[in-house]
């Protein structure tokens, strides 16, 4: 399995990757993207099984990325890892096709609970 982690903060990408490993997903290949536009290109070139995206990023936000993927007919598994945790934002994310929203600060247990139904 391959997971694409999209966040404009390199440090946050590393924290997400470390937390994935702590949650038991250390055998998955990880690909990084520095913003939504980079993630959109890497979905095509890397064919990940899951995208974990921040909400607020330059060039293309996480929700714009998700809408672009769905608009192109791409049903890739998609979830947000973000500090934007309002009920309205979560509703927008789910209506656009996100499977889950993990709110920062997060724990390995939060990742495991969100990812287990998606990755098995």
Regions found by a protein language model. Give the residues of each.
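Acidic, metal-coordinating helix/loop segments flanking the phosphotransfer/catalytic sites
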Residues: 32-50, 71
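Acidic catalytic/metal-coordinating carboxylates
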Residues: 35, 61-67
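Active-site residues of response regulator receiver
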Residues: 54, 82
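C-terminal output helix
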Residues: 88, 106-115
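Alpha4 helix (beta4-alpha4-beta5 surface) of REC/receiver domains from two-component response regulators
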Residues: 64, 85-100
